[in-house]
Regions:
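A conserved beta-strand-loop-helix scaffold within acyl/acetyltransferase catalytic domains
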Residues: 1-112, 158
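Acyl-donor binding region in acyl/amide transferases
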Residues: 97-159
Length: 164
């Protein structure tokens, strides 16, 4: 947090303290540590997030998440929040040799600052622990700027194979 000005550091500390005050514990699981029950919960929360946002179920299927869990576990991590040992929220990350990519998140209910804890602060910690030099927390959101993320130009290229 060295590059974050004083009032922002104070805000981050306050937000993180609020997580503890809500009796929320967060664990970051990697690859095969993410069991089928957590994946199932994650997908339910993913759908819930999209339903709230735009009335859809999201554009990725449960089969997609099952497939990536099997085929690329070494590039996946998930921050899971627990309250009284019950999982209540998840944030999915992908990573390569130098970059962490934060992409999807969901929660069973609204909790103060939990989105920031899972999607930003735990991601930053994970990236540091893994020696990753960049954290791409995704597009949009002015709330990211005051938490230390600077806007950058991003290029994206996708190839979607169709079986026909």
């Amino acid at each position: 947090m060295g590059g974050v000005v004083g009032w922002k550091r104070k805000m981050v500390r306050k937000e993180r303290a609020e997580i503890a005050a809500q009796n929320i514990e967060v664990k970051v699981l990697e690859g095969t540590e993410i069991g089928p029950q957590i994946w199932q919960l994650f997908y339910q929360l993913y759908e819930r997030t999209y339903a709230k946002r735009n009335g859809t179920r999201g554009y990725l299927t449960e089969a997609f998440f099952q497939e990536i869990a099997l085929t690329m576990p070494e590039q996946i991590a998930m921050a899971v929040a627990y309250q009284s040992d019950i999982p209540i929220a998840c944030a999915l990350y992908f990573y390569d040799a130098d970059t962490l990519y934060g992409r999807y998140w969901g929660s069973v209910a609204e909790f103060s600052y939990l989105h920031f804890e899972l999607c930003y602060y735990r991601g930053i910690e994970f990236a540091i622990e893994k020696g990753l030099t960049k954290y791409d927390a995704g597009a949009q959101g002015e709330h990211k700027i005051i938490r230390g993320f600077e806007p950058i130009k991003t290029h994206s290229l996708h190839w979607i194979e169709h079986p026909q």
